[in-house]
Amino acid sequence: MIIMGRGKIEVKRIENKTSRQVTFSKRRAGLLKKTHELSVLCDAQIGLIIFSSKGKLFEYCSQPHSMSQIISRYLQTTGASLPVEDNRVQLYDEVAKMRRDTLNLQLSLQRYKGDDLSLAQYEELNELEKQLEHALNKIRARKLELMQQQMENLKKTEKMLEKENHDMYQWLMNNQMYKQESAAMDHEDHHHHHEHQQAITELNLLGEQPLLSHFTFFGDQEQPSTSTVNHFASISLTSPPANSISPYRLQPSHPNLQDSHVHGPSYD
């Protein structure tokens, strides 16, 4: 029961967990503050230890002392002593347990290796067989997993190499086609150039021959040759338009034939 100015307040455990935690935090801070003020103002050595409901430790110790010094001084002053716990029995038990575990591990290792099975009972051998089969299944599963991973890596590598091979093949084919097209174009240009040069040569040779040698005059019974006709055709095809040639009448070279009134011989 706490008596305050406005009335009496009953002190009891706060049932609400949240309210209890908030109250604990506020009261703890106030208690630590008052303890510090008392230590400073009155030069008192104070050691305050607080454990929360969850087991969390809060403490305060007057400077420059430590909590262990204050507790030792308390024990000396009161004549009390801390109980010394004999841990030898507990240590013996732990050592014995470790020895048993080590022996069991050694026996299990020997049985797994098949070194000493003379003292093993049927149940122990059956259990050992199950354990070995289980371990063997795990080993096989892991081995299969590694093999599958290697196969996947090999497939990826194969696909990558196939793609590189396909790209290289396409590049070679395109390069070969380009070379063939370039060679064909060069050959065609050379052929056209050769034909052009041959035509020019023929025209030059034709220009050097007399023009009248390609015609047959009156009274000549010899028919023109095929080469003459071809030359004449080429001259006709390559000659300039008629309107660009000035009219010119061919005249025989004999003086008697140059008369405009030429008559044949008369026979009376």
Curated annotation (Swiss-Prot):
One of its GO terms (cellular component) is nucleus. It is found in: Nucleus. Residues 88-178 form the K-box domain. Coiled coil: none annotated. It comes from the Eukaryota. Disulfide bonds: none annotated. SUPFAM superfamilies: SRF-like. PROSITE patterns: K_BOX, MADS_BOX_1, MADS_BOX_2. GO terms for molecular function: DNA-binding transcription factor activity; protein dimerization activity; RNA polymerase II transcription regulatory region sequence-specific DNA binding. The keyword Transcription regulation applies. InterPro entries: MADS-box/MEF2_TF, MEF2-like_N, TF_Kbox, TF_MADSbox, TF_MADSbox_sf. Keywords: DNA-binding, Nucleus, Transcription, Transcription regulation. GO terms for biological process: positive regulation of transcription by RNA polymerase II. Residues 243-268 are annotated as: Disordered. Gene3D superfamilies: Transcription factor, MADS-box. Residues 4-64 form the MADS-box domain. Its main location: nucleus. This is MADS-box protein FBP24. The gene is FBP24.
